């Protein structure tokens, strides 16, 4: 039987409880789930890539899925190219709302055309729908406490950033 290998990518800057929920749920459907922290040249990161990897790996220890989940990072390549190199059988994406659906439908088309790799979509739980990294960065920049929406270790790192100001 073919091993089921998934790939869930993002910038995770910062990691949210919504991201963790998708990772936990997706890991139940794969023998191996890669979580790729990728650089996005169109975003100005709050945390360097290595720090985001460290925070994600620490947050994953609370989920009891570390035996199935491997965090990887990549600076410059298409997700589908990385997926082919890793032998991925399906890409994992999360949908929070209709805007996500429209964006992901377009990506699905090109990913399928270029590689034939399927995409599996996970709907965000209703209580996690509003969460996204951009909103967390914005709220944090204006001095708001985001600890209810991010893992504890991420909240701690955000407080450290505040102390450096």
From Swiss-Prot:
Binding site for substrate: 11, 43, 79, 93
Catalysed transformations (reactions): (R)-4'-phosphopantetheine + ATP + H(+) = 3'-dephospho-CoA + diphosphate
Compartmental location: Cytoplasm
Pfam families on file: CTP_transf_like
SUPFAM superfamilies: Nucleotidylyl transferase
Keywords tagged on the record: ATP-binding, Coenzyme A biosynthesis, Cytoplasm, Magnesium, Nucleotide-binding, Nucleotidyltransferase, Transferase
Cofactor(s) listed: Mg(2+)
Residues annotated as site: Transition state stabilizer: 19
Assigned EC number: 2.7.7.3
One of the protein's GO biological processes: coenzyme A biosynthetic process
Pathway entry: Cofactor biosynthesis; coenzyme A biosynthesis; CoA from (R)-pantothenate: step 4/5
GO cellular component entries: cytoplasm
A GO term, aspect molecular function: ATP binding
Residues the entry annotates as binding ATP: 11-12, 19, 104, 128-134
Domain of life the protein comes from: Bacteria
InterPro entries for this protein: Cyt_trans-like (IPR004821), PPAT (IPR001980), Rossmann-like_a/b/a_fold (IPR014729)
Enzyme class: transferase
UniProt keyword Oxidoreductase present: no
Keyword ATP-binding listed: yes
NCBIfam families for this protein: coaD_prev_kdtB, cyt_tran_rel
Family to which this protein belongs: Belongs to the bacterial CoaD family.
Subunit structure: Homohexamer.
Function noted in UniProt: Reversibly transfers an adenylyl group from ATP to 4'-phosphopantetheine, yielding dephospho-CoA (dPCoA) and pyrophosphate.
Protein name as it appears in the record: Phosphopantetheine adenylyltransferase
Species assigned in the record: Lactococcus lactis subsp. lactis (strain IL1403) (Streptococcus lactis)
Name of the coding gene: coaD
């Amino acid at each position: 039987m073919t091993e089921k290998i998934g790939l869930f990518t993002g910038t995770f800057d910062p990691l949210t409880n919504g991201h963790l929920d998708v990772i936990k749920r997706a890991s139940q459907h794969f023998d191996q789930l890669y979580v790729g922290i990728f650089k996005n040249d169109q975003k100005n990161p709050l945390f360097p890539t290595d720090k985001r990897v460290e925070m994600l790996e620490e947050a994953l220890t609370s989920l009891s899925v570390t035996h199935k989940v491997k965090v990887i990072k990549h600076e410059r390549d298409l997700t589908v190219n990385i997926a082919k190199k890793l032998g991925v059988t399906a890409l994992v994406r999360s949908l929070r709302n209709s805007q996500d659906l429209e964006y992901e439908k377009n990506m699905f088309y090109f990913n399928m055309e270029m590689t034939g790799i399927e995409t599996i979509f996970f709907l965000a739980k209703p209580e996690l729908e509003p969460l996204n990294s951009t909103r967390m960065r914005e709220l944090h920049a204006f001095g708001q406490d985001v600890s209810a929406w991010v893992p504890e270790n991420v909240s701690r790192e955000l407080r450290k950033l505040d102390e450096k100001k």
